[in-house]
């Protein structure tokens, strides 16, 4: 009785989920190589011109006065529409001040957005189709981008699309025909990023969690049923021969693939559910906030009076600087200049520049933020390790790993070129590290470092899962067709067929 009930639940849940799980597996192959289009800070820097030092006439203190800030969490100098600007943020309030005239930027004009988009794409603005957009579309559906609406959207005949935020003047999204195709093959179906659903964040989240939980259940039931029915002693017969599996046709293939891939299917569905934070998980270690505050302190109005940004840039001679960050590291005011080459220079208020922090300096900064005897060691890493990794190799290297001697064996990864915290691991993060990243992406240390071995193994599992789902789709269609046929067949016809010994269709 219990077995029949489990079979019924597996069958009908499978009918309901077959198409969705098929899409997840098939799009998982795309996700191995293509992500959802996005614009990172490094993308903006790569396309930004170098700062014109001679045009910077406004001090940081003057910029603070212009926007009415006494302090700021972030302050940097960069180029906007060919002019140097200060970008200041205090909490959730962000302001832009032109560093050549001390004028505060209001909402950007269409003409300015035209120049920004043309500079980004390298194409003539006259060839673009332009529209103002306040509504969320497929490429601005992610929350960080959606918050920067309204935008000007530019589309060129070759398929390039550039979205310029009217509020910040930044390019917040950029797509090409290839990147959009990659998203349609991978991220959009895999994440259920259908715009009418995704723009309602809470509803989308609940739906993904429910579908993933149901898929986990259906895979677990299928695996249980398969193990119940599997007979190592070949107690079933088919075509006059003893067999281990009591099914024929598509059911037989479904059972074989399910026994081979059922565990993988179940863990993929479960780990995918974990990506949505279905239940509260422990966060970062308590020392994280103290370390972040030490590495990026609050900037006061007069913090950089001893050396203005223009003077700091001049101290680098002819170096082409794209961005100048004003930071407070361990209560010491510093400038972090990002060069055209991508390298950085750290400039003190005495005008002395260096390329990075040394390992002992980073360790001392962390020790100042926590109990001094908590620091168990600090080392430089030139390659990713098991807790600091990036399959697409976008996270910075080298980094300084600072280990604490606390109960959670906390690990902090700090970029020595910027003194920025770029990674954290604590024993309480094991669920995210191993049950999500480990099971969902197979980001295991013995595998993810080795390409194309990782591609072969993960791709093989994805293809096998897709094949398993193909059998599910066929069986789902057969179940639905049989059920509908019975419902549409008159009752007297069913009784007549039964009396005459004809099988039901």
Please name every model-derived segment.
Residues 1-505:
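Conserved histidines in hydrophobic membrane contexts and catalytic metal-binding motifs
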């Amino acid at each position: 009785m219990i077995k029949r009930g489990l079979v019924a639940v597996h069958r009908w849940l499978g009918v309901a989920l077959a198409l969705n799980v098929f899409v997840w597996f098939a799009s998982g192959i795309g996700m191995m190589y293509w992500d959802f289009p996005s614009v990172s800070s490094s993308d903006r820097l790569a396309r930004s011109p170098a700062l014109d030092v001679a045009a910077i006439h406004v001090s940081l203190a003057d910029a603070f006065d212009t926007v009415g800030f006494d302090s700021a969490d972030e302050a940097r100098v960069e180029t906007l529409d060919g002019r140097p600007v200060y970008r200041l943020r205090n909490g959730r309030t962000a302001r832009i001040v032109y560093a050549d005239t001390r004028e505060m930027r209001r909402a950007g004009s269409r003409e300015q957005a035209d120049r920004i988009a043309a500079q980004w794409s390298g194409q003539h603005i006259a060839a673009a189709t332009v529209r103002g957009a306040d509504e969320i579309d497929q490429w601005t559906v992610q929350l960080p981008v959606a918050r920067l609406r309204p935008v000007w959207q530019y589309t060129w005949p070759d398929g390039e699309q550039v979205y310029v935020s009217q509020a910040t003047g930044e390019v917040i999204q950029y797509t090409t025909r290839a990147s959009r195709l990659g998203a349609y093959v991978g991220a959009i179906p895999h994440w259920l990023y259908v715009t009418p659903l995704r723009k309602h964040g809470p509803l989308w989240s609940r739906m993904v969690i429910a579908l993933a939980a149901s898929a986990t259940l259906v895979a677990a039931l299928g695996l249980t049923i398969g193990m119940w029915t599997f007979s190592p002693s070949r107690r079933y017969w088919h075509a006059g021969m003893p067999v281990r599996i009591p099914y024929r046709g598509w059911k037989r293939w479904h059972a074989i693939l399910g026994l081979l891939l059922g565990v993988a299917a179940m863990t993929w569905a479960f780990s995918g559910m974990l990506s949505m934070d279905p239940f509260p998980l422990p966060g970062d270690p308590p020392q994280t906030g103290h370390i972040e505050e030490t590495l990026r302190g609050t900037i006061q109005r007069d913090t950089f009076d001893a050396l203005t940004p223009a003077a700091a840039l001049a101290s680098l001679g002819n170096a082409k600087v794209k961005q100048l960050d004003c930071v407070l590291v361990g209560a010491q005011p510093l400038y972090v200049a990002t060069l055209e080459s991508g390298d950085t220079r750290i400039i003190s208020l005495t005008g002395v520049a260096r390329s990075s922090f040394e390992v002992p300096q980073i360790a001392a900064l962390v020790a100042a933020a926590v109990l001094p005897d908590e620091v168990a060691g600090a080392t430089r890493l030139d390659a990713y390790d098991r807790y600091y990794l990036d399959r697409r190799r976008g996270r910075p290297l080298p980094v300084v790993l600072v280990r604490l001697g606390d109960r959670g064996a906390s690990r902090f990864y700090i970029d020595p070129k910027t003194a920025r915290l770029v990674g954290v691991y604590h024993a309480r993060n094991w669920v995210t590290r191993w049950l999500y990243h480990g099971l969902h992406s197979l980001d295991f240390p013995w595998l993810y470092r080795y390409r194309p071995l990782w591609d072969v193994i993960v791709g093989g599992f994805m293809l096998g899962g897709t094949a398993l789902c193909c059998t599910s789709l066929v069986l789902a269609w057969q179940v639905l067709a049989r059920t509908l046929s019975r419902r549409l067949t008159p009752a007297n016809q069913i009784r007549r067929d039964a009396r005459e010994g004809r099988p039901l269709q």
